[in-house]
């Protein structure tokens, strides 16, 4: 049984489909969860707004060092940091602009780097957990996803390197590797697909919560597939 009692967890991207599931699982396990929000409208769909165990931090851009520092500075007993925030786009490389490339790198790789760095600084040599979100195209060659795959490959490499760097201090760093998640957006985009093969956000949240928990006593430096049958 997972137990986060007395522990604080940062969850970026916490208002999205997967992020909300992670927040819900963590508060069920007793965590105080800090959720940064950049676009205020995102809170309208966030089911845990106003929950006594959730701290919402509005107006924070995770691509800016100062905003990330303010987020982690608001914690007092940080134990884990879960980085779900990111973005997706695809298309032939010939049609991919430099702006699109840099946008995806910032959304996926830069935000992950800044949050990992600030989490390590905040933990300050103490025990903790970091969980990143990579993606299957970063590991399995996939056409028309050059920019997206590269940005998530950066997340994967960051995870593996940081896991070695922080091992002695007891900070376990891992990443989950999803393929297609069963969300309303994905169902609408792929109406003829086998939706039953896709893992739900709640199922993936279970894996994330374990990796972020004190009960994860040995797993570090892992890129954990959460594909389901997809």
Go through the PLM ranges and name each one.
Residues 121, 164-168:
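Alpha-helical segment proximal to the catalytic Tyr-Lys
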Residues 15:
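Conserved glycine-rich cofactor-binding loop
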Residues 116, 151:
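Active-site helix of classical SDR
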Residues 135:
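Residue(s) in the substrate-gating loop at a strand-loop-helix junction
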Residues 168, 175, 183, 193-230:
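C-terminal helical subdomain
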Residues 96, 141-149, 161:
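Active-site loop-to-helix junction immediately N-terminal to the catalytic Tyr of the SDR YXXXK motif
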Residues 92-93, 100-102:
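Substrate-binding pocket helix/loop in short-chain dehydrogenase/reductase
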């Amino acid at each position: 049984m997972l137990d986060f009692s007395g522990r604080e967890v940062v969850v970026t991207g916490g208002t999205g489909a997967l992020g909300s599931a992670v927040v819900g699982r963590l508060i069920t396990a007793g965590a105080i969860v800090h959720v940064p929000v950049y676009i205020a409208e995102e809170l309208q769909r966030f089911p845990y707004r106003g929950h006594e165990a959730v701290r919402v931090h509005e107006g924070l851009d995770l691509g800016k060092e100062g905003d990330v520092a303010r987020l982690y500075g608001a914690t007092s007993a940080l134990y884990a940091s879960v980085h779900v925030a990111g973005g997706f786009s695809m298309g032939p490389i010939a049609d991919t602009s430099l702006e699109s490339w840099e946008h995806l790198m910032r959304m996926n790789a830069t935000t992950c780097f800044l949050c990992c760095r600030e989490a390590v600084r905040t933990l300050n040599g103490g025990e903790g957990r970091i969980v990143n979100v990579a993606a299957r195209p970063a590991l399995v060659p996939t056409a028309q996803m050059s920019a997206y795959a590269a940005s998530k490959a950066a997340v994967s490499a960051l995870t593996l390197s940081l896991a070695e760097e922080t091992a002695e201090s007891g900070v376990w760093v891992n990443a989950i590797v999803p393929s297609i998640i069963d969300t309303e957006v994905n169902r609408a985009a792929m109406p003829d697909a086998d939706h039953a093969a896709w893992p739900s956000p709640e199922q993936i949240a279970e894996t994330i919560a374990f990796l972020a928990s004190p009960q994860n006593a040995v797993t570090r430096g892992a890129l954990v597939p959460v594909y389901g049958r997809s």
